[in-house]
Amino acid sequence: MITGMTIDAGTSLAPAFMLTLNSQDITSNFSDRLISLTMTDNRGFEADQLDIELDDTDGKVELPLRGAVLTLWLGWQGSALLNKGDFTVDEIEHRGAPDILTIRARSADFRGTLNSRREESWHDTTIGELVSTIAKRNKLTASVADSLKKIPVPHIDQSQESDAVFLTRLADRNGATVSVKAGKLLFLKAGSAMTASGKPVPQMTLTRNDGDRHQFAIADRGAYTGVTAKWLHTKDPKPQKQKVTLKRKPKEKHLRALEHPKAKPVSKKTKAKKEPEAREGEYMAGEADNVLALTTVYASKAQAMRAAQAKWDKLQRGVAEFSITLALGRADLFPETPVRVSGFKRVIDEQAWLISKVTHNLNNSGFTTGLELEVKLSDVEYNAESDDE
């Protein structure tokens, strides 16, 4: 049974939850038997997961049917509980002795047609129209970031791919992230901390006193210093080769604690040349010291640029990892929330962070929240240098 928890001020806090099964409140049936409850909030098409362990030493717990829908509310007694979503039961485990029943459920939105393979070709459309079409046939509501809606998609094949896999591939090419939450198909700019309507997600501030464990690691930033992508099309009957080098130009002059050594401003004299697009060429984001070459050959220079920029940004976000377990659970935190921290090492405190994964744990020790964070990129402009070969 979950008990109260005392904090330093002497105030007694007790975690609280509410659980419904097919819209019927079953909280009272579970509360005295609850050993642990873990809810994992993922981003992208990795399904959110709910794990519940119940004491069944008297053998009176009835096994729920696979396919039943659980809805979870989570928080603290005396405060409004937050709805954490619907979960469809797909695994049941009973073990002993002592007898324990484990119920595992995953996001209801990730079952069914989204995972069915399809064969389809898309022509002369936009990301906004494409996502809306897929959302409609999966009985979802599309929500696409304004900066992505009008990106043209001249042609792309969905060959024996599920809609989930296909949309993930499309998102990777265009620096986006795709997920399904509360009946909505979200297609948003990756790492932007923006909602689909273009409004910023409010920043949260965490101090070291909020957590009881943390871990920080800096990755090998020198592994890749740039990304190249090639394109090939037939607009120009006389093939020309063109190489375009991308460099970051911060909008504000400030020192980012974890900035990639190759992600630096360039001279103001550098300007992108306006000229007819070459039939084929190569686009590079970053520097040429140690380049990651994308294997896909894109249909246009614009597509190659977006793919290279998306991959380069992803590499930049991975230069460091930071995780923290909050001693007092925060049901209001979710992936893509921007976070500032204080009380740690300078290099950690000075960096802007973005939540990539949230794990809520409820057991006899209390209610805790584990956060996994990645580097939040500042808004940047790009300068391109074109060299004809």
From Swiss-Prot:
Basic residues composition-biased segments: 240-254, 263-272
Subunit structure: Homotrimer.
Domain of life of the source: Viruses
Intracellular or extracellular location(s): Virion
Pfam families: Phage_GPD
Protein name: Probable baseplate hub protein
GO cellular component: virus tail, baseplate
